[in-house]
Each structure stands twice: as C-alpha cells, then as structure tokens.
Amino acid sequence: MSRAVGIDLGTTNSVVSVLEGGEPTVIANAEGFRTTPSVVAFTKDGEVLVGETAKRQAVTNVDRTLSSVKRHMGTDWKTQEIDGKKYTAQEISARILQKLKRDAEQYLGDTVTDAVITVPAYFNDAERQATKEAGEIAGLNVLRIINEPTAAALAYGLDKGKEDELILVFDLGGGTFDVSLLEVGKDDDFSTIQVRATAGDNRLGGDDWDQRIVEWLIKRFKESTGVDASTDKIAKQRLKEAAEQAKKELSSSMSTSIQLPYLSLTENGPANLDETLTRAQFEQMTSDLLDRTKKPFKDVIKEAGIEVSDIAHVVLVGGSTRMPAVSELVKQETGGQEPNKGVNPDEVVAVGAALQAGVLKGERKDVLLIDVTPLSLGIETKGGIMTKLIERNTAIPTKRSETFTTADDNQPSVAIQVFQGEREFTRDNKPLGTFELTGIAPAPRGIPQVEVTFDIDANGIVHVSAKDKGTGKEQSMTITGGSSLPKDDIERMVREAEEHAAEDKKRRESAETRNQAEQLVYSIEKLIKDNEEKLPEDIKNEVQGDVDALKAALAGEDDEAVKTAYDKLNESQQKLGQAIYSAAQAAEAPAAAAGEEASAPSSSTGEEDVIDAEVVEDEEKKQQ
C-alpha cells in the first residue's frame, strides 16, 4: 500500500514527515540530515543536484544554482537559460519535492504517492495553485494544501491538555512571515483546530536578515580595499553563505568573526575580508525588519476580537525565530509570555502536515482541521468597484452566491472579473481571472438576473461560476496558475487598504455618484421620450438642458461638477412630474387613470438611488 507524507516546502529548507503507528516521524535525507536545503543546481555535465550537495557547490556554479525559489511561486518568473531551457518556479520546486519523495521512499521501503504540502497562510490563490502544480510535476497526488501555522498548531496542540485553548503561531521562515491565532477545542477523544485569524508578509524572512549582513560586509570591504564585491557573482555567493553562518552564530554568541580569504583581487594582490560583527550591531541594522512583524501580530489580535491575555500558548515556527531579538519581541508583544520552546521550529510544520495526511487517509480519526481564506474575494462591478462575496478569514471550505444585473439595455453578455484583496477598487487588488457569460436574453438594464457563485475548496483554491437565471446558461472557471498575471505583495494590499481608507472611500463615493448620475440621465431621457406630447416645450427644453449639462459633466473628470449637475437635474425633474400630473388632471377620467400609470415610474425614477450591479439576492452557504 502506498504511503502519504507531510511536506514543509520551505524557502530555505524543506522537511518531510510520515505517520508510523499513528505518530509522526521526521525522515532524514540521504545525506543524514533532517532538513533539506531548498537548493537546486544544474552541473555543466548535465547532472541535477538537490539539497545539501547543490548548496555545497554553489560558489563554483553560481549561475546554475537556484535557491529561495518559493518567493517566485505564482508569478511568471523563469530561470535564465540553462542548457537551452528556462525553468519555472514550479519546475524547480518539483525537483525539491522529488528529492523528498525519494528520501521518504528509501526510508519506508515503500512507494510514496500522496502528500499534504504546506504553504504560508498568506499565500494567495496563484501561489497555492503553483504549489499544487509543483507537487503534481514531482509525481505526487496532493491530498491537501494547508497553511503552515495551522500545521504547526496541529502538531503542537494535540499534545496539550483537554481544555479549549487559544494558540498563537508566530512563523518567521527564510522568505515568508505569518502570524495566526488558532482555537483548539477538545473533548475526551476528539480535537477540533480552527483558525480564528491570520495575517502576514510574503516578502519578509531570514533571507532579508542575511542580506543586511551582506550589504554591511560589501560596504566594509570596499572601505578597506577599494574593491566593490557586489559586482562579482562568486564573491557575492561567498558573502551570502558567510552572512547566513554569522546570523546563526549570533543567536548563541554576542559576536562573530567573518573571515573570507582571497575574496577578490587588487593591484597589490589578493584582498581578504576579516570583520567582527556583534549581536548589537546586527540587531541595529535589522531593527526595521523586526518592526515589520509587529503590525500583522496586532492585526490578528484585533481581527479575532481577543485580548493578548487570552492566549494560552505561543509557538515559534521557522528557523529565523531562533534569533534572540525575535523571541524577545514576541515575548514583549504577548505581555511577557514566554514562547514555547518544546517544539523544533524547523520540523513542527512538516509534523503537522503528516498528521493531516493521516487524517485524510483515515489513519487518524481524532482531529478536525478548519482553516480560513487569508484575503477577501469578489468581482468588479460598474465603476471599478470591488464587490466582495467572501470576506477574509472566512472558514473554508465555503460557498457564497449573490445575484447581479446588467448595466446597459439589451446587454448580450457580462464579463465576470475575479479579484482578491482588501481595497475598495479592483485596480488596487490582485486579478485572479476573467470569464464571460454570453447569451443573455435581450432586456432593459436592471432586468436580467445573473447569479455569481464563489466556491473555495479545502485547499483554498477558488472556483467561480455565473448563471443567467432567465436562460439557464452557465459559465464557470477554476482560478489556475496566475503565472501570466503581475505579482503583487499581498501584505501591501491589506496595509494600503488601511492607510488609504479615506482616499478609497472618496473614490468609491465618486464612482457611486457617477453611477447614479448615469442612471438619472437614462431615466429622465426615457421619461421625456415617453411623454413628449404631454410636456410643455419650455419645461422639456429646461430639463433636457440639465440632462445635457450632466452628460457633459460625466464626460469630464471633475467630480464636483458631476455632483452639481446631478443635484440640479434631480431638482428640475420634478417639473416633469408636475407637468405630466397637470395634463392628467385636465384629461378625462380614463385618460387620468392612464396618466397616473405613466406618472408612477417618474416618481420612482426620480427618488430612487439605483446603483448598477446592485445585489438583489443574497444566499450564503457555508460548508464546515
């Protein structure tokens, strides 16, 4: 029988774990280490090296050695040409997964086909899909994509007591950062782990701390020798490796010596680097990176609606949390609570993934995992407005439907444009994809009903469908790849959503005013046309003049001019109603009755604020 494993596919290191007798075991690789560097190298004789062997030869093969590829997942990034081929992030990640798969098979003496792979909680849809594709390229059946902090809580939470508890997971890896708050509910023989809130930064990790040391060393080397090492690829690789080692040493020592003989050549001969870096210097040069971890932490506490004192356990995940400044900051932010030191920050995520694999394969039946979607999902409606159907931190899997309408008369189709993010306007959010629902029956604007349904599966991958209720025609798509879309920083979306809240509100109000103005122009022109014979020429000309003025304002960029013209037309349109009513009073009773029917839509049109793409039906289904 084939086995299922749990894999932590990390930016700098990866780990594989398996359940044996219901208990997780971390599998050592062929080189004897429990973590495998996420490094892939192509040698000049055509061999592909992965892990420790690839990392060791990086200095002599800089251009053909690839690391930190996880930062490119879900983008259109490709390697430079290697032996006539350019590789995607998925293909390079697949090489790492293949290595982990082989090591697991060698350890188990059995084939491995199924895997649960972890991703940062703040990975968007394209990044998750790319991770799943990498697994498939590696020959794995990806049972589930789960969030790294959730996996850590799963591994940590099940060993604790029987009471319900809140666990905060602070996950600072090599390239990504997440904070998650999870609730562990227990009874005698069953545990439920539910994610309450999550936040993070997909462009913050240990690599950034290493880079600060590299920059400092380049500067010091130039000051002492006059040589700019940043232009030498081999020198930069040596500096990068030295910086990583120095960072690790400063976690247990107050200072470290960095010595790189023959780093470069000058007119006077070889130039050596010999520097001493203290922990205080290191913490000073990286203080702004540490500060960037504070906001996601505060966001999670606020989002979950709890006090810091409600947190029962703090779990540190990721090798970067070994830095004393990081654990000290976590202690300060949690009101002096000591972070738990009982878990291995490098291995706990893979252990949780193995547990989840066991649950999905039926080997463990005592736990239920409930995850959340990290960002809001919605579609673009008229004016470029982001209409959210699923809010961030909604439990998944989930399904949500809303009904929209058309913006123009006899509109034959609607384009469903799907976005992910927190801003009020779609242009500030990440596009996930577009599809078109065609064959809508001809009808005036506002009459057709198009039901849009968002369905997020347990992997956090989005499926969207649209159905014309009139004709029954339906179109759907699964958001895949995202490789052709520009890559936006997800944390930036949430941060800017708060920073630009006032600006967004003003822009949204402007868009809504323009929508209302267009609707008013449409309805007044229709009213004039339908009642042309009943309206006195002077009133008709006056109102038509106001209509033309509003149309001219709409053609320009001045929002105040639109509002002024809108208010004037809104006022003058009442004269139309009075004129039609007077004509009706003067006519005979049957005519009067007909006149009242004609006047009914006029008052409705004049007083209602109708917004295109208005939601007319709301139906929510959530699957737990």
Curated annotation (Swiss-Prot):
Residues 606-618 have a biased composition (Acidic residues). Pfam families: HSP70. One of its GO terms (molecular function) is unfolded protein binding. Keywords: ATP-binding, Chaperone, Nucleotide-binding, Phosphoprotein, Stress response. Induction: By stress conditions e.g. heat shock. The keyword Nucleotide-binding applies. InterPro entries: ATPase_NBD (IPR043129), Chaperone_DnaK (IPR012725), Heat_shock_70_CS (IPR018181), HSP70_C_sf (IPR029048), HSP70_peptide-bd_sf (IPR029047), Hsp_70_fam (IPR013126). It comes from the Bacteria. Residues 496-512 have a biased composition (Basic and acidic residues). Residues 496-515, 583-624 are annotated as: Disordered. The modification Phosphothreonine is found at T176. The keyword DNA-binding does not apply. Residues 583-605 have a biased composition (Low complexity). Acts as a chaperone. Belongs to the heat shock protein 70 family. This is Chaperone protein DnaK.
